[in-house]
Every structure is written in structure tokens, then in C-alpha cells.
Design a protein with these regions (language model features):
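Thiamine diphosphate
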Residues: 1-131, 136-137, 153-154, 173, ...
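Glycine-/acidic-rich phosphate or pyrophosphate-binding loops and their flanking alpha/beta elements
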Residues: 13-16, 248-272, 285
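Short helix-loop-beta junction
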Residues: 46-51, 249, 286-300, 349-350
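Glycine-rich beta-alpha junction loops
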Residues: 114-115, 172-179, 199, 278, ...
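Conserved thiamine diphosphate
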Residues: 123-167, 171-174, 353-368
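Conformationally flexible catalytic loops at phosphate/diphosphate-handling active centers
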Residues: 167-263
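Redox- and metal-dependent alpha/beta enzyme cores, enriched for Fe-S-associated oxidoreductases
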Residues: 264-296, 309-316
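Peripheral docking tails and interdomain loops at the edges
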Residues: 328-400
Length: 400
């Protein structure tokens, strides 16, 4: 179905939504190596090129490290680039992954998230993307197929901004989103061209025969190396406010608003808030609606931008709450908790008094469903904590 401005409404899987976003963003070079559950994204892009719909160079690397290394060269030469991967593929490209961030290359990568080995399991999880969150890439986590498409388009606008120039991950759960079909509105090409036009005009250093230069040469220990890291951190910090502006502009053009770094859902007057990240958010929103209808003052906050961590937005959103229940689909081993819960502690200590009670709920590991009954238990437990009752700080929902 076609709507205004050349937009189309289709039912498609998350991987196809990612491919459609890349098609609309017009990259110069695409380099993907097949790995479940990402493979169909790369296949779709190859078909777009073969059918003449996309004017881009498609490479056929022998592995993930090479796939990203090819894009490093293309990006250094000034090209717009894209890749996608999952799980062990992401681990295999770790060397190139670090090189990309350190060189401030605006490469966009989709991660169809999957559990890492061992034990082996080709199932949904967030652990693969979570493990590289300290590598210097900006990271976004999507709730739906529509958000995958929109986030990739916005990622190019952010990554290629002359004040940012950092690589961006768009992360979404494998299987639950990569192979799950949903209604998706595809923007018109002219709309996307207008939205991305500022990114295409951004100034950055490029490899050029007329003006030869060296990228990533050996750096003598001392002030120069420190300056590299300082400027990277400064750009990371700027990305938070810059993305708020990009999200606002995207909303004005395309009519879809995501809230910037976080989405606040019925949380303004809530006593209890649950914090989610990824595909389980839709289920959690439905439970919040049900509890609201029953008279409970409960809300939800969805983490969209994990890196850089949205400290300022979370401080404002969580201030004055009585209890917070964080649902994590990942594990932070040394903390015996989830990563989002652990990150959130640095925010909570700056709130109050009183500081909200914070609880962690590990769920959905190994591709298991996060069902409404689990979310109801999160809310009930958080309410008990808000009333001063003794509850466990961390609960593994599938085991306890």
C-alpha cells in the first residue's frame, strides 16, 4: 500500500526492514558475511544491487573481520558504508571493530543479537552486542521492525555529523525481530534524501591521492594519544544531545517520535517504573496499560541509546519514583546482575533523597519468551519494595 510522499506500508521481517533502511540511505559499499540470524539482511541487499535498485559495491569477504576491514578502507576514502552481523561474527571482527572506533569512522552496523557460546545456542539474546559496549561505538537498541528501519536512517545522520564522526550499532534481537514480521511504513526516497542531506555535506578527513595522508599511524605515548581519547569521549558526549535534535527532526518529517535517548511511557506520575531494552518492551507496555486500567500508578522507560549511557535523561525521568524494576536480557557476571541494572546504579546514587529502590530481573536468556506474567511479577515485586517489604535485589525469573 502506498501513502503520501511515496511512502509504502508493508509487512516485513526485521532483517528486511534493516535492508530497506540501507537501500534508502544509499551507501557506497556494503560488506556482509552470512551468520544466523542476520543472513537475510545481507541477502536482501545483494538482491537490491543485482536488481538495479541500489548503486553500491557489494563485496564477498571470507569472514567477518575482513567484512569490516573492507569498510574501514571504504570509509577512510569517504564512502558511506554498511555491514551487519551476529554473535560469533561480531566477536571475530573485534580487532577491526576497535580500529573503526579509534579512527572515528562513521560506519553503520546492524547487529541481529544472538547468545554467545558457550553453551552453544542459535537463539535470541543481547550478550553479543552488550560485550562490545565499551569499545567506543554508539549503540541503539530497537523494539520493533519499524524502529529498526527508522534507527538505521537516523544512524547515518548521527554518525556522519561533523561534530560526531563515530560508528553506530543498531541492535535488535535475532529471531524475535530479525525473522518476525510486522507492519512497517517505508519512507519515500525524496524524504530520506532531504533528511540525510546534512550528513552528506559534512566535512571529514579522507584518503585522497591529491592530498596524501596517513591514518592510524603509530602514536608515540604521551599527550597526542591522550588527545585522541579525549576527543573521542567529547564526541561521545555530544552525540546524546545531537541525537535528541535528530529524533525531533525525524519526527517532524516522518511523523514517528521515539523520544531520543530513552522513551518514557506513562511514567510522569508513576510511583513504580519498569526499565526495558529491546523487543520485550511491547509486552511490557501492554502490561503497564493493564495495570493502569486497574488503578496502579506504573510506567515504563525504554533504553534506546545504551552508549553513550543517557545519564541526564534517566536522572530526570526517575527522580521521585519509589521503586524501579529493571528487566535485563543479558548477564553482568561480576555483578551477579544484568548490565542495564548495573549501569543504572550510577544514576540512582545521584537522585533523592529518597533514592528509589532498584530491583533487577534477569529474563529471556537463551531465547526464552518474556511473557506478560513475568512483567506482572516485576511490577508486583517492585510495589512490594516500594511499600518497604523485604525483596531480593536480583531475581532470575525463569529459575525462581
Amino acid at each position: 500500500m502506498e501513502t503520501k510522499e511515496g511512502r509504502q506500508v508493508r509487512v516485513m521481517e526485521g532483517n528486511m526492514a534493516a535492508a530497506q533502511a540501507v537501500l534508502l540511505s544509499k551507501p557506497d559499499v556494503i560488506s556482509c558475511f552470512p551468520i544466523t540470524p542476520q543472513t537475510s539482511c545481507g541477502e536482501a541487499l545483494s538482491k537490491f544491487v543485482a536488481d538495479g535498485l541500489l548503486d553500491a559495491d557489494i563485496t564477498e569477504p571470507e569472514g567477518e573481520n575482513t567484512a569490516l576491514s573492507i569498510l574501514i578502507g571504504a570509509s577512510m576514502a569517504g564512502g558511506r558504508t554498511f555491514t551487519s552481523t551476529s554473535s560469533q561474527g561480531l566477536s571475530f571482527m573485534y580487532d577491526a571493530y576497535l580500529f573503526t572506533a579509534g579512527n572515528r569512522l562513521p560506519i553503520v552496523m546492524a547487529i541481529a543479537m544472538r547468545e554467545q557460546v558457550s553453551p552453544h545456542g542459535v537463539v535470541a539474546g543481547q550478550q553479543d552486542a552488550i560485550l562490545v559496549k565499551a569499545a567506543g561505538w554508539i549503540q541503539f537498541y530497537a523494539e520493533s521492525c519499524q524502529e529498526i528501519l527508522d534507527s538505521i536512517i537516523m544512524a547515518y545522520r548521527l554518525a556522519e555529523d561533523s561534530e560526531i564522526l563515530l560508528p553506530v550499532n543498531i541492535c535488535y534481537e535475532g529471531f524475535y525481530l530479525s525473522y518476525h514480521s510486522q507492519r512497517v511504513e517505508i519512507p519515500g526516497q525524496e524524504e530520506v534524501d532531504r533528511f540525510l542531506a546534512p550528513a552528506g555535506k559534512a566535512e571529514r578527513l579522507k584518503l585522497c591521492l591529491e592530498n596524501p595522508m596517513t591514518f592510524s599511524s603509530y602514536t608515540v605515548p604521551g599527550e597526542l594519544y591522550t588527545e585522541y581519547r579525549f576527543k573521542h569521549c567529547a564526541a561521545f558526549h555530544r552525540a546524546k544531545q545531537k541525537y535528541e535534535q535528530i529524533d525531533e527532526e525525524f519526527s517532524n518529517i516522518f511523523g514517528r517520535r521515539y523520544g531520543g535517548q530513552i522513551e518514557e511511557y506513562r511514567s510522569d506520575d508513576a510511583d513504580v517504573v519498569i526499565v526495558t531494552m529491546g523487543s520485550c518492551t511491547g509486552t511490557a507496555k501492554a502490561v503497564v496499560d493493564k495495570k493502569r486500567d486497574a488503578g496502579l500508578k506504573v510506567g515504563l522507560i525504554k533504553i534506546r541509546m545504551l552508549r553513550p549511557f543517557p545519564v541526564e535523561r534517566l536522572k530526570k525521568a526517575l527522580n521521585g519514583k519509589k521503586a524501579i524494576g529493571v528487566i535485563d536480557r543479558n548477564v553482568f557476571y561480576s555483578g551477579f546482575c544484568g548490565h542495564v541494572f548495573f549501569e543504572l546504579q550510577s544514576v540512582l546514587k545521584e537522585l533523592g533523597p529518597p533514592i528509589p529502590v532498584s530491583l533487577n530481573f534477569i529474563a529471556g536468556l537463551g531465547g526464552t519468551d518474556i511473557v506478560p506474567q513475568m512483567v506482572e511479577r516485576v511490577i508486583e515485586t517492585a510495589y512490594s519494595a516500594a511499600e518497604g517489604k523485604a525483596v531480593k535485589p536480583v531475581t532470575w525469573l525463569s529459575l525462581e
